[in-house]
From Swiss-Prot:
Signal peptide bounds: none
GO MF terms, alphabetically ordered: DNA binding
Organism: Zymomonas mobilis subsp. mobilis (strain ATCC 31821 / ZM4 / CP4)
Entry annotated with the keyword Protein biosynthesis: no
Major subcellular site: cytoplasm
Keyword Transcription regulation: yes
Official protein name in the record: Probable transcriptional regulatory protein ZMO0153
Taxon lineage: Bacteria, Pseudomonadati, Pseudomonadota, Alphaproteobacteria, Sphingomonadales
Gene Ontology biological process terms, A to Z: regulation of DNA-templated transcription
Disulfide bonds: none
Family, similarity comment: Belongs to the TACO1 family.
Keywords recorded for this protein, A-Z: Cytoplasm, DNA-binding, Transcription, Transcription regulation
NCBIfam families given in the database record: PRK00110.1, PRK12378.1, YebC/PmpR family DNA-binding transcriptional regulator
Coiled coil: none
Cellular location(s): Cytoplasm
Length: 249
């Protein structure tokens, strides 16, 4: 998603990531527990759990925390979380898909609706946004994993469908059904990835001007700050110069 990784870097430079470390661990822990409950509590036998554990490690979550999250699932402890997806629109008509894990759907719906309405957006109906996205597998590696040519060749050999590389990371896209097979092949070549997940890839992007971009990024940040929100997908494109200026504010 164009602009998204740069937005993450801007937030990092502002020091926001350090302040949100515990919140991040909470989200990662929740996903590990839900993934463990969805199948066997063994990452080697449960692809979703393996991906969740990989994401937790990449997020800097201590091994003990990860093991406790799995133990909650084995022991039947912890809340029962429901996976809910919301669709909406932001400034400039940008489409948003908001994936959540919640133990209180009324609270989550209210928070999502409020975040949208206060930042130039509105909640849509089911299917109002997803038709403009493709459901695909997404494997991410840091830029240091290799130059774009090396990553492209490895991804092609592993059966991926597309690769996009930036100064920060490599995004490797696969067919939905091939995600974990491709991830396994790539891990043997490139090492453990930063992330392995099912994703929503926009079919087209909307270019957002500077005024709307600031509001849009605040909206995404507000949504991602919510404890129940796991991931926000969007179809925006923001020029690099605009992103740099926003990062200096």
């Amino acid at each position: 998603m164009a602009g998204h990784s740069k937005f993450k870097n801007i937030m990092y430079r502002k020091g926001a990531q350090d302040k949100k470390r515990s919140a991040l661990f909470s989200k990662l822990s929740r996903e590990v527990t839900v993934a463990a409950k969805s199948g066997l509590p063994d990452p080697n036998a449960n692809p979703r759990l393996r991906a969740a554990v990989s994401a937790a490690r990449s997020g800097g979550m201590p091994k003990d925390n990860i093991e406790r999250a799995i133990a909650k699932a084995i022991g039947g402890d912890g809340d029962n979380y429901e996976e809910l997806r919301y669709e909406g629109f932001g400034p400039s008509g940008v489409s948003l898909i908001i994936e959540t894990l919640t133990d209180n759907r009324n609270r989550t719906a209210t928070n999502v609706r409020t975040a949208l309405s206060k930042n130039g957006g509105n909640l849509g109906t089911s299917g109002s946004v997803t038709h403009g996205f493709d459901r695909m597998g997404l494997i991410t590696y840091k830029a240091e994993a290799g130059d774009p040519d090396k990553i492209f060749e490895a991804a092609l050999e592993a059966g991926a469908e597309d690769v996009t590389s930036s100064e920060d990371e490599h995004e490797i896209w696969t067919a939905q059904a091939d995600l974990h097979e491709v991830a396994g092949k790539l891990e043997a070549i490139l090492g453990e990835p930063e992330g392995v997940k099912l994703a929503w890839r926009p079919q087209t992007l909307i270019n957002v001007d500077e005024e709307s971009a600031g509001t849009l990024l605040r909206l995404i940040e507000t949504l991602e700050d919510d404890d129940d929100v796991q991931t926000v997908w969007a179809n925006y494109d923001i020029d690099d110069e605009v992103m740099e200026r926003l990062g200096q504010e």
